[in-house]
């Protein structure tokens, strides 16, 4: 059976990257909540 996680740098950036997060209102909300929580890493 194929595993669910098939790593790809391109996909990772496209789906979870900082610029992608910044491009939508909800994405900015995600970053804001992670800043508020004090995450060391905000996005992939």
Curated annotation (Swiss-Prot):
Gene Ontology biological process: translation
Ordered alphabetically, the record's keywords are: Ribonucleoprotein, Ribosomal protein
This entry's Gene Ontology molecular function terms read:
structural constituent of ribosome
Q: Which domain of life is it from?
A: Bacteria
Q: Which residues form a coiled coil?
A: none
Which cellular component appears as one GO term in the record? ribosome
Q: Where is this region: Disordered?
A: 1-44
Bias (Basic residues) occurs at 1-19, 26-44
InterPro entries listed in its UniProt record:
Ribosomal_bL34, Ribosomal_bL34_CS
Family (UniProt) = Belongs to the bacterial ribosomal protein bL34 family.
Protein name according to UniProt: Large ribosomal subunit protein bL34
Q: Which organism is it from?
A: Listeria monocytogenes serovar 1/2a (strain ATCC BAA-679 / EGD-e)
